Amino acid sequence: MAVMAIGLSIACLAAKAQTIAGKITGKITDSTQQPLNAATISLRIVNKPKPVKYEVSATDGTFLIEWRKAGTYTITATAVGYDRYESAPFTIDSLHPESALPAIILKKAVVALAAVTVTSKKPFIEQKVDRTLVNVEAMINSAGSTALEVLEKAPGVRVDPNGSITLKGQQGVAIYIDDKPSYLSGQQLQNYLQSLPATVIAQLEIMSNPPAKYDASGNGGIINIKTVKEKMKGYNFGISSGIRVSKYTSTNNNLDFNYRTNKFNIFGTFSAGNRNNFNDIDIYRKYMDDDGNTTGTFMQNSFIHKFGGGYRASLGVDYFPSKKTTVGVLVSRLERYPKSTNRSLGTLYNENHQPDSSLNSNNDENGSFINNRINLNIKHDFSKNGPSLQANVDYLEYNTNNDQVLTTDNYTSTGSLKSEDQLAGYLPANIRIYAAKTDYEQTIANQWKLEAGAKFSYTKTSNVANYYNVIAGVSEPDYDKTNHFMYDENINAGYLNLNRMFNKLTVQLGLRYEGTLSKGHQLGNVLKPDSSFNRSYNNLFPTLFLLYKLDTNSNHQLKFNYGRRIGRPYYQDLNPFISPLDKLTFYVGNPYLKPSFSSKYELGYIFRNRITTTINYSDTRDQVNETIEINDQKYYSRPGNIGKTTSLSFGIDAFFNPKPWLTFQLSGQMNYIHFKSSFYTGTLEVKNQYYYTQALVQFKLKNNWTMQLDGNYTSKSKNAQFVFAGRGRVNYSVSKMVSPKVTVKFNVTDVFLTGINKGDIANLKLTDANFRTLSDTRAALLTVSFRMGKRVEGQRKKIESGADAEQDRVKDK
């Protein structure tokens, strides 16, 4: 027994001796000494192929592997577009518990696309000092989806049932495409994002507080959608085709190509497809007298079918007269031909809930949306790692048209036809935007990075609404609804930005000036007088970003940022138009809208570049919201300024990769919002607490199969007058790489059909109202993609557009 006890004691001591607090540290850079973020590091026992642990490099390229077992090891490092690196063997034991590896330099890969399968990938989320990056290519269920559906899965981003996009609880988000503003908003922005296939999106840049380099417009911040671009010399092209099946069937097809030599880079895309979806809407309104007694009710069902096709094409050429200079031109054209039919049946009831009359409405719309754009740019680097100067000139033109015929049959309580009305509308619009900007960058004393620039933009819009009452086949002008509105706007801006990285602290300071001159002119008619307005305002917009590393390995980081923003009204919202949806529902413009201003603060903690927690506070004056007014039982929807809005939110975003084949992404947001403003009914004051949560899990299976499950849920929430019920959805997707050239992806959205939009509308004059909308959120999507080509090392320099804010302010209707 004594011998056995001694033997067990020796074994335990030996086992204890082999358990150590080991640490392996290092830094990964490319051949130009630039740190590589999100490179995959694998720890292996010498002569054994299976890794025992994985890590991902931080934003500064550093990594830390904690390991408790003694032995002889080697590490490998991989990153997309780079050759694999393997270290020399090293030992971890009680005498050598820590190993600081020499600098790891990854070399650019030279590959033939048809002959290699890249197994390393970027993480779903990356954190920078002034933005969050979402790598869309890491989401397999993006296949067959649209840009709008991709945005719904991004951390902190919420797309409400009306298509309005909020970021960390804030409205007024500006959408950019490849550093160029979309100049779209409302229904037009929603339509555009639905027409943009997810297969052409590489990354989302989410900036809740954008730096001074970006335009100050957009109280909610900026979401920059970066499309896929080939950065290597050689040639490549890709083709993808997808089909979406729900109640109706839609298709989406995409082609992209790139060819680069020492002197030229030619690239382009072409997308074509059709949209085919629906909204099934139930509306209930209860009318009351001053004592709260019911005087009548209105119940309506509307089935709206939206369909139509279109295409999007772009072509760009870069010329490299020298290694230091790039001259480029980019042209693009977007054509869409949306159509819709709205079949509505509404019944009016008296105070005893007996049918009084009914309305049967048919609203047919036939539209067109054409956007042409040209960008000229030049960039010159005066020396390697030295000053650089970039200039852009942009011209954009939007031509839209919408022909509308609204027919309403009015029936008595017995079902007899009482009257028949027909209203025809013709609504052409034109928007022209001219913009020019310059940007200068220089490093001062090898410490401070200086950025400075200036911008000029001029926008001219013309919106016409011609309405006619059709009686017995004869058209008579309806001057009450007919309107012609013109609007001119000039913005001049300049900015200065300074950035410095100290030992553990990164500081970025910015100041932007913007001066605005605007003029609106409504041409009169026989019923309406001619009217106009002029406005001028000049403002400063400071920004501050701080990022502090609590340790040398960037495992624990603190960040803080502050910024001031402006929310300029959308161009068409200033147009005092009136557009009927049916006999009792109208959309109206507001020429008296004022710009809104907000101050935003954010404090955050980042753990190992995987978990980020943030606290956000904002104070906004004159925020623009949709408002609802009831007059003579008619429902008017118009944009209006909400006097003061304060918002406080707490958020967490987490990314886990516990196994090589398993990935988790979790996001959550708690929001408190307080609205207070003068209103149609007196004072509007809304206090609201709600939460939003999102989860994603991805499995990498054998034989090049990948599976993904994700979902989200939003609790009951309020937005000015709107009270939305809680809703959520679950999505499923699976992907198979058939060969290095061919990938097939299948996914189902809203599997359990829980994404139903319903709620109430508050603060209506002597009226209660609620709604329920069923859309084709549940759908099956199948996408097949093919890619081939040959590429060698070489990168296209990033060129930004000069039109950086105006494109977010264009609307369809």
Task: List PLM regions with ranges.
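Short, acidic, small-residue-rich periplasmic hinge/interaction motif at the N-terminus
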Residues: 29, 40-44, 78-82, 97-140, ...
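Surface-exposed extracellular loop regions of Gram-negative outer-membrane beta-barrel proteins
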Residues: 517-519, 553-600, 615-633, 751-765
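N-terminal periplasmic accessory domains that precede
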Residues: 103-105, 147-150, 189-191, 218-240, ...
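Outer membrane beta-barrel strand-and-loop segments of large Gram-negative receptors
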Residues: 433-437, 478-483, 594, 600, ...
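Outer-membrane beta-barrel signature, preferentially recognizing the C-terminal barrel domain
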Residues: 483-490, 566-619, 637-648, 657, ...
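Transmembrane beta-barrel wall of Gram-negative outer-membrane proteins
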Residues: 248-280, 293-342, 370-372, 542-544, ...
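Short, acidic Ser/Thr/Gly-rich low-complexity loop/linker segments typical of extracellular
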Residues: 46-62
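Short acidic/polar hinge/loop motifs at secondary-structure boundaries
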Residues: 180-208
